[in-house]
């Protein structure tokens, strides 16, 4: 009987151990640094940041409860300073909130903190990542334009509008 009790306690402890680890992680305040190349009163920038915070909240991450979002609004002359400030805070991740203009200063500020970018036209051409499939380094993100898809886009255009003989891209 003692052997069964011991095995029961051991099994219960083994089953509960991962739950204790998860509980400890939830107590740790996570930190996100956001660099925006916009004025702090820019309506579009505020809307983007609000949407980001709302999406995080839906996933259980609430600013002030288990997450801290540090945002810096930068202009051309002080973007490097703001990127360095954010990197010095040692966040869990940095968000380059307004595309190409914010990625380069963040990469100059840190090569260890993960950087996530949004709406960068050509991250490979800009030297932010090695490739889209395997970015390497500490930067990754979303591109709004993939040059290798140009042929497919023209093929689809021809299929949708066979009478079109010329197309221009701006």
Q: In which residue ranges do the predicted regions lie?
A:
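Short hydrophobic alpha-helices and adjacent helix-cap/hinge residues
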Residues: 1-170
